[in-house]
UniProtKB/Swiss-Prot annotation:
<comment type="subunit">
    <text>Part of the 30S ribosomal subunit. Interacts with proteins S7 and S18. Binds to IF-3.</text>
</comment>
<dbReference type="GO" id="GO:0005840">
    <property type="term" value="C:ribosome"/>
</dbReference>
<keyword id="KW-0699">rRNA-binding</keyword>
<keyword id="KW-0689">Ribosomal protein</keyword>
<keyword id="KW-0694">RNA-binding</keyword>
<comment type="similarity">
    <text>Belongs to the universal ribosomal protein uS11 family.</text>
</comment>
<dbReference type="InterPro" id="IPR019981">
    <property type="entry name" value="Ribosomal_uS11_bac-type"/>
</dbReference>
<keyword id="KW-0687">Ribonucleoprotein</keyword>
<dbReference type="Pfam" id="PF00411">
    <property type="entry name" value="Ribosomal_S11"/>
</dbReference>
<dbReference type="GO" id="GO:1990904">
    <property type="term" value="C:ribonucleoprotein complex"/>
</dbReference>
<protein>
    <recommendedName>
        <fullName>Small ribosomal subunit protein uS11</fullName>
    </recommendedName>
</protein>
<dbReference type="InterPro" id="IPR018102">
    <property type="entry name" value="Ribosomal_uS11_CS"/>
</dbReference>
<dbReference type="GO" id="GO:0006412">
    <property type="term" value="P:translation"/>
</dbReference>
<dbReference type="InterPro" id="IPR001971">
    <property type="entry name" value="Ribosomal_uS11"/>
</dbReference>
<dbReference type="GO" id="GO:0003735">
    <property type="term" value="F:structural constituent of ribosome"/>
</dbReference>
<dbReference type="GO" id="GO:0019843">
    <property type="term" value="F:rRNA binding"/>
</dbReference>
<comment type="function">
    <text>Located on the platform of the 30S subunit, it bridges several disparate RNA helices of the 16S rRNA. Forms part of the Shine-Dalgarno cleft in the 70S ribosome.</text>
</comment>
Length: 129
């Protein structure tokens, strides 16, 4: 019995003028997510997913490449302006913002949303190398 071919509709990409870029910069990796104003993800990229492994993953250059990839993927939605939210202490904080600017987005606002404890949990012990 032959299957009747089901017609698949091509998804229409919605056009968004303003968006938000969430940069999560940890010590080991950098994750960039570009969302619309409601927080729905449009594109994302990581330093590890951009071809960097091990200690090279935690470099500013890896964060720059990841931000460029996420920025190019989000171009399909017609984004022009970005509001950047930076979270974490990692080395890719500044380079990812510069890369998003170089892709062609107008950055309207940069906000640091790193959670700062009011003397909460005990931090990890200092490394002895």
């Amino acid at each position: 019995m032959a299957k009747t071919p089901t017609r698949s509709r091509k998804r229409v990409k919605k056009q968004v003028a303003d968006g938000m870029a969430h940069v999560h910069a940890s010590f080991n990796n950098t994750i960039i997510t570009i969302t619309d104003r409601q927080g729905n993800a449009l594109a994302w990229a990581t330093a590890g997913g951009s071809g960097f492994r091990g200690s090279r993953k935690s470099t500013p250059f890896a964060a720059q490449v990841a931000a460029e990839r996420a920025g190019e993927m989000a171009k399909e939605y017609g984004l022009k302006n970005l509001e950047v939210f930076v979270n974490g202490p990692g080395p890719g904080r500044e380079s990812s913002i510069r890369a998003l600017n170089a892709v062609g987005y107008k950055i309207t606002n940069i906000t640091d949303v790193t959670p700062i404890p009011h003397n909460g949990c005990r931090p990890p012990k200092k490394r002895r190398v």
